[in-house]
C-alpha cells in the first residue's frame, strides 16, 4: 500500500493504526514507541532471508541474493530495497526481536508476538545441531497465527498494597453488576511479596509460577486424542475450557500445538490466563492442578497458624540463593515442573548452605524453561527428544532461542531432579490416588520425630481432595542409581496403584509386552517419602507425590498427612541441629 503504513511480513495490514505500541522489555531496540497496525491474513510457516526489490529478478539473481546481499554485484544491489537476514544478529542466543536489513537502506524492523527464532533454514545441512555454531544455516523464523507475547490491554486499575497486608496469594475479584456466577465473576490472582531484601517470616513458600505459565490456557481436554485415556474418564469441561476452545486468541500453553501443528514453545503471562483462577477446576476433574492445588497448601498453613512469606519462581530466578538464605525453611508447591538454570543453582546452593527445604510435589525440576533475558514475563520451553511430553521439537531445533542452550529435560543436561531434590519422576496416572505405608527407616531415632502422633502400622493418606488419596497424579521415587543421596532415609512408600498409573517413557528403552505394565505390576510405579540431612545442619523432606497437599484438610485438618507435614515444618524451623 502506497501510504505510511508499516511494511509487514507474514501478515497484511487491515487498519493502519491501533493505538497499541511496542517499546522496552524485549523490544529494547525500539528507542521510541512503535505503533502497531491491526493485521489480518497472518501466515503459518517459516520465512528465511526475505528480499524486496524494485523489479522481478531472475533465478540467478534470486540465488545470488539468497547467498548474501554483500556478495551481489553493484547492479543487483541497486535494485534491492531490503535484504533481511534473520541470522545476522545471532550471538550465543537469538532472543532479540530486532531484525536486520543488510542493505544501505537499513530498513530494520521487529518481530511481533515472538515467533520462534533459532530455527533451521532453507540451507540447513544437519552438520550442526546448535544454531549459534552455524548461524547462517539458522536464518528461519517460524511464524504462527496464534503466537502471542503480550495482549497489550490497557490498564484498568492499579492497587497500592498497604503495609499492614501480609505476604501471601491474593486475587482481585471482578464482578458484573455484583453478581456471583461463572459468567459474571472472575478472580485475577497476584502475589504480595515481603518488602524487598527483607523477610516477615522464617518460612518461605516459592509459588511455582513457571509451571503455571507452561500450563497456561492449556487445551488438552478439548484437543488431545489421549485426554480420556490419561484420566480414565471423560474430561469435565469448565466454562473457561469451552470459552478458550472458541477463542484461541488468548494464546496457548506449552502443552498445545499451534494451528499448523508445530509445538508451542513460548508462553507469556501478559495475557488473560483463564485456567489460573482460584475457582477453576481442571479437566482432570475431580482433581485440581497448579495454582488451585497449591492453594490447598496456603489454606493449610493459615489453618495451622504457620506464618509464611510468598515469592514466585521469577523472584527466585532474579534474586537467587541470597533470597532463600534469609529463611529457615523453604517450601515448594505441588508441581514445580519447570525451572530455569538459575533456579536450580539457587536450590542446590541453599541446601549446601544449611537451608532446610521441603519439596511438596512430584515431577519437579523436570523441563528446562528459560526466561526471556529482557522480559521475565515470558518463558521458553523446547520439548526435546525425550521425556513425557505433548510434542517434540524438530531436528536441529532443540536449543532455546532465549539462552542458546540445550532445551528439553534437565536430565539430558546432567541435572536429573534427584540431584536437586533427592527424588526422580517415575510414574503418572490421573484416575485415582492411593496411600502410603511406613518403611523401617521411619522408626529410626533420626526420623521418628517426623511421625510423632502417627501409628507404626497406620495407613497414610488414604483420603484427600485430589483423586481420593495422598499418593497420586504424578509420583517420584527414591533411586540411588539415579542420584538420590546415599544418606537419604526412605520413610514411606505408596502402594496399590491402578494400571492407569504408568512408568515415565524416558526410562523405557524397548517396548516389550508384559514387561512394564501399570501400577499393579510395575515396582517403579510408586511414591517414595524421603528425608536426608545436608551440610551445615540443612535437610530435605519430600513425600514424592503431586496429590499430597490435597489431603491436608481432610477431617477438619486432623489427619496423618497433616501431622507429618506439620512435624517436618516445625522441626525444620527449630534452631540447632536436627535429631
Regions found by a protein language model. Give the residues of each.
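Short secondary-structure boundary/capping segments
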Residues: 1, 66-67, 100-101, 219-223, ...
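Extracellular glycan-associated modules
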Residues: 1-117
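Solvent-exposed loop/turn segments at secondary-structure junctions
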Residues: 14-15, 91, 197, 209-213, ...
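Aromatic-Pro/Gly-enriched surface loop or interdomain linker
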Residues: 114-149, 179-323, 576-577
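Helical hinge/lid and interdomain linker segments adjacent to catalytic or ligand-binding clefts
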Residues: 146-147, 158-160, 164-166, 177, ...
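Short, aromatic- and glycine-rich surface loops/edge beta-strands on solvent-exposed regions
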Residues: 168-174
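Structural motif
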Residues: 204, 328-333, 540-542
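Glycine-rich, aromatic-lined ligand/substrate-binding cores of catalytic
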Residues: 374-562, 571-572
Amino acid at each position: 500500500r502506497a501510504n505510511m503504513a508499516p511494511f509487514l511480513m507474514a501478515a497484511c495490514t487491515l487498519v493502519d493504526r491501533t493505538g497499541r505500541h511496542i517499546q522496552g522489555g524485549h523490544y529494547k531496540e525500539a528507542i521510541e514507541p512503535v505503533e502497531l497496525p491491526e493485521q489480518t491474513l497472518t501466515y503459518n510457516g517459516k520465512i528465511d532471508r526475505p528480499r524486496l526489490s524494485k523489479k522481478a529478478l531472475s533465478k540467478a539473481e534470486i540465488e545470488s541474493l539468497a547467498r548474501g546481499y554483500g556478495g551481489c554485484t553493484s547492479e543487483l544491489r541497486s535494485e534491492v530495497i531490503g535484504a533481511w537476514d534473520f541470522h545476522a544478529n545471532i550471538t550465543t542466543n537469538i532472543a532479540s526481536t530486532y531484525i536486520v536489513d543488510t542493505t544501505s537502506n537499513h530498513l530494520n524492523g521487529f518481530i511481533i508476538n515472538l515467533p520462534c527464532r533459532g530455527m533451521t533454514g532453507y540451507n540447513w545441512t544437519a552438520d550442526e545441531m546448535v544454531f549459534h555454531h552455524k548461524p547462517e544455516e539458522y536464518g528461519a523464523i517460524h511464524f504462527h497465527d496464534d503466537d502471542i507475547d503480550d495482549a497489550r490491554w490497557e490498564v484498568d486499575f492499579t492497587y497500592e498494597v498497604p503495609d499492614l497486608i501480609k505476604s501471601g496469594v491474593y486475587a482481585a475479584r471482578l464482578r458484573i453488576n455484583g453478581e456471583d456466577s461463572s459468567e459474571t465473576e472472575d478472580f485475577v490472582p497476584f502475589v504480595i511479596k515481603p518488602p524487598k531484601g527483607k523477610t516477615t517470616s522464617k518460612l518461605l513458600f516459592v509459588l511455582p509460577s513457571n509451571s503455571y505459565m507452561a500450563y497456561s490456557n492449556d487445551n488438552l481436554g478439548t484437543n488431545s486424542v489421549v485426554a480420556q485415556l490419561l484420566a480414565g474418564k471423560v474430561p469435565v469441561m469448565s466454562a473457561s475450557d469451552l470459552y478458550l476452545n472458541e477463542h484461541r486468541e488468548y494464546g496457548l500453553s506449552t502443552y498445545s500445538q499451534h494451528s499448523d501443528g508445530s509445538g508451542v514453545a513460548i508462553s507469556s503471562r501478559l495475557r488473560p490466563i483463564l485456567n489460573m483462577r482460584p475457582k477453576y477446576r481442571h479437566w482432570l476433574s475431580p482433581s485440581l492442578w497448579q495454582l488451585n492445588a497449591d492453594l490447598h497448601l496456603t489454606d493449610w498453613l493459615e489453618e495451622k497458624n504457620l506464618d509464611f512469606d510468598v515469592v514466585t519462581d521469577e523472584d527466585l530466578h532474579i534474586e537467587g540463593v541470597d533470597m532463600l538464605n534469609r529463611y529457615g525453611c523453604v517450601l515448594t508447591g505441588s508441581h514445580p515442573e519447570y525451572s530455569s538454570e538459575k533456579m536450580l543453582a539457587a536450590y542446590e546452593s541453599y541446601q549446601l548452605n544449611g537451608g532446610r527445604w521441603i519439596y511438596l510435589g512430584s515431577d519437579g525440576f523436570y523441563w528446562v524453561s528459560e526466561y526471556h533475558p529482557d522480559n521475565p514475563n515470558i518463558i521458553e520451553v523446547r520439548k526435546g527428544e525425550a521425556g513425557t511430553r505433548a510434542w517434540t521439537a524438530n531436528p536441529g531445533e532443540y536449543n532455546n532461542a532465549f539462552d542458546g542452550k540445550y532445551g528439553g529435560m534437565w536430565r539430558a543436561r546432567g541435572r536429573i531432579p534427584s540431584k536437586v531434590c533427592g527424588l526422580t519422576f517415575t510414574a503418572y496416572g490421573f484416575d485415582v490416588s492411593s496411600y502410603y505405608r511406613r518403611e523401617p527407616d521411619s522408626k529410626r531415632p533420626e526420623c521418628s520425630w517426623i511421625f510423632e502422633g502417627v501409628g507404626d502400622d497406620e495407613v497414610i493418606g488414604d483420603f484427600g481432595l485430589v483423586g481420593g488419596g495422598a499418593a497420586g497424579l504424578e509420583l517420584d521415587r527414591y533411586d540411588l542409581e539415579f542420584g538420590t543421596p546415599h544418606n537419604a532415609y526412605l520413610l514411606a512408600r505408596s502402594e496399590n496403584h491402578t494400571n492407569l498409573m504408568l512408568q515415565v517413557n524416558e526410562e523405557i528403552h524397548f517396548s516389550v509386552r508384559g514387561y512394564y505394565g501399570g501400577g499393579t505390576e510395575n515396582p517403579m510405579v510408586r511414591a517414595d517419602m524421603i528425608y536426608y540431612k545436608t551440610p551445615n545442619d540443612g535437610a530435605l523432606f519430600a513425600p514424592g507425590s503431586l496429590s499430597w497437599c490435597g489431603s491436608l484438610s481432610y477431617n477438619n485438618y486432623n489427619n496423618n498427612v497433616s501431622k507429618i507435614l506439620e512435624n517436618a515444618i516445625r522441626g525444620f524451623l527449630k534452631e540447632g541441629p536436627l535429631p
